[in-house]
Regions:
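N-terminal nicking endonuclease/strand-transfer module with a His-rich metal-binding environment
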Residues: 1-125, 129-188
Length: 188
């Protein structure tokens, strides 16, 4: 089951500062070698700049909560080959949050920024900062986790089917894998 962790800060001087610090973190967290990395940010409309993220933080209406969300597929059951489309999974997760908020009668859209972290741990994950009006209770978080897990498992099945078809086609066509460098070195 995918892990979806959340925490929130209320809009205000301190909350806005923490939200902006979170944007800097998700964009620049050091990689495995402790090197500073510049990760591309994205939101529901596609690529997003850090200044655009800061702007939606500054423009957040009264009553806004800034949710920090971490989306982490299960590496043994869902992201076995580290090949899931994490942006698509993020879109599904955020769409679920939008549906929950809309069901509360809130018409203010959920605005968010995210970055994929696939370079400092063996577990691919996404960090999201979302500007949310309304509430997310435990049943809501369970629903978000279930929708995210379902999206991960559906992608895993599709990817595994594609890999299986590719292997069958290669076998049928008499394809053999390229020798490894060790095999080349020994003349095998």
């Amino acid at each position: 089951m995918a892990v979806v962790k959340t925490h929130f800060e209320r809009r205000g001087k301190v909350g806005n500062a923490k939200a902006k610090a979170n944007v800097r973190y998700i964009q620049h967290r050091p990689d495995k070698d402790k090197e500073r990395v510049m990760r591309p940010l994205f939101g529901s409309e596609g690529p997003m700049t850090r200044l655009e993220a800061y702007q939606f933080i500054d423009d957040a209406p009264k009553g806004t909560k800034f949710f920090t969300i971490i989306i982490n597929p299960d590496p043994e059951k869902e992201d076995t080959h580290k090949d899931l489309d994490m942006r698509a999974i993020t879109m599904t997760t955020m769409q679920t949050i939008e549906e929950i908020i809309t069901a509360q009668g809130i018409t203010t859209p959920v605005i968010w920024v995210a970055a994929v972290h696939d370079d400092h741990t063996d577990k691919n994950h996404v960090h999201v900062l979302a500007s949310v009006q309304g509430r997310l209770d435990k049943p809501d978080l369970d629903r978000i986790r279930e929708a995210t897990t379902k999206a991960c498992l559906e992608q895993r099945r599709e990817l595994d089917r594609a890999l299986s078809r590719q292997a069958q086609e290669q076998k049928r066509d008499g394809w053999e894998p390229e020798p490894t460098l060790e095999e080349d070195a020994w003349g095998d």
